[in-house]
Amino acid sequence: MAWLSTILAPVAFSPRCRGATQYAETLASHFHSQLTLLHVVPPPLGLFTALEAPAYSTATEVSEETQEKRKAELAQYAEGLCPDVAVRTEVVFGDPAHEIVETAREDHADLIVMATHGYGPFRRFLLGSVTAKVLHDAACPVWTGPHLEQAPDYRNITFRRIACAIDLADSSRCVLQWAGQFAREFDAQLDIVHVLPHTLIELGGMYFDPEWRGHAVEVVRQGICRLEQETHTSGEILIEFGDPPLAVAGVATSRKTDLVVIGRGKHGGLGGRLRANAYAILRESPCPVVTI
């Protein structure tokens, strides 16, 4: 069975969504995955104005009519995808975030690929609420980014360099393992990034002894080397200093990274140092981000 055998791509018929679908096409083509295109029809009051809604006798009529229309649109949307990919379409009615998470669970999806609502110079303020909820609740990895509308045609998407940003928490092993396997699949270079915040190397405006800084770097390097051995993964270790989201984005920009892989918290949200910055990393990253 393929590593990513089932991929779920929510479709909202927007340019950003189309870009996300192109990444999903590339992955499904490479891994010979089943690609499910999911469109969620929100409750009627979210679709119609107060003047339009009374024209329908019941909410059932509204939902059924809308669902049939969306099914036709989604089928047409699917026809434009890569002919080599096995595509299944599904239209459901309900809360978008809830339905995306539930569909992923029921289908045993290995990956969700979806766009955020952020774009342009204001993207850091605009991580969509649906994306945020999916990131919080989904059990499988989520592939997203605020700039996916800029994605090239699926045939021109390449993965030459992968950055795996870890904080050495317990979940870092799974994150590095996923990033390493993805890098091997595409014969890509792997950078393993750890960020030491400035608060760890300065206190009250005074920097610690440079020898202590060097000791901290060595401790981190040894921890990463142990993870590499445990996961049978190897990459170039990059230890940065500063604000984690900005440092990770800086590495991704300077090294022309094609994908950033990070961890996110479990059972109640995002936790830990790097994981606490997961949303900020998503907003700042110049390339797509997979959260594990």
Question: What is the predicted function of each stretch?
Answer:
Residues 10, 96, 139-141, 165, ...:
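Proline-centered helix-kink/hinge sites
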Residues 2-57, 157-206, 210, 232, ...:
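Small/aliphatic-rich secondary-structure junction motif
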Residues 25, 75, 79, 132, ...:
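Active-site phosphate/pyrophosphate- and oxyanion-stabilizing loops and adjacent acidic/basic residues
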Residues 56-70, 209-219:
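A short acidic, glycine-rich active-site loop
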Residues 3-5, 26-30, 101-152, 250-292:
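Gly/Ser-rich helix-loop-strand patches that form or flank binding pockets
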